[in-house]
Amino acid sequence: GCKKDRKPCSYQADCCNCCPIGTCAPSTNWILPGCSTGPFMAR
């Protein structure tokens, strides 16, 4: 889920987006939009 509200990433898209592997990134990630290979914002 998202870092602050702990809701599923798909619930609040402006918080974070989930990749198939389940990690999250800011929706403003310009390198891989909505994706991350690290634990950033994963909780």
Swiss-Prot record:
Any one annotated GO CC term: extracellular region
Residues modified to D-methionine: M41
A GO molecular-function descriptor: sodium channel regulator activity
Summary of the tissues where the protein is detected: Expressed by the venom duct.
Domain of life: Eukaryota
Keywords recorded for this protein, A-Z: D-amino acid, Disulfide bond, Ion channel impairing toxin, Neurotoxin, Secreted, Toxin, Voltage-gated sodium channel impairing toxin
Subcellular location, principal: secreted
InterPro entries in alphabetical order: Conotoxin-I_CS, Toxin_19
Cystine connections: C2-C16, C9-C19, C15-C24, C18-C35
Classification via PROSITE patterns: I_CONOTOXIN (PS60019)
Subcellular location: Secreted
Propeptide residue intervals: 43
Annotated domain remarks: The cysteine framework is XI (C-C-CC-CC-C-C).
Family assignment from sequence similarity: Belongs to the conotoxin I1 superfamily.
Function of the protein: Iota-conotoxins bind to voltage-gated sodium channels (Nav) and act as agonists by shifting the voltage-dependence of activation to more hyperpolarized levels. Produces general excitatory symptoms.
Name used for this protein in its record: Iota-conotoxin-like S11.2
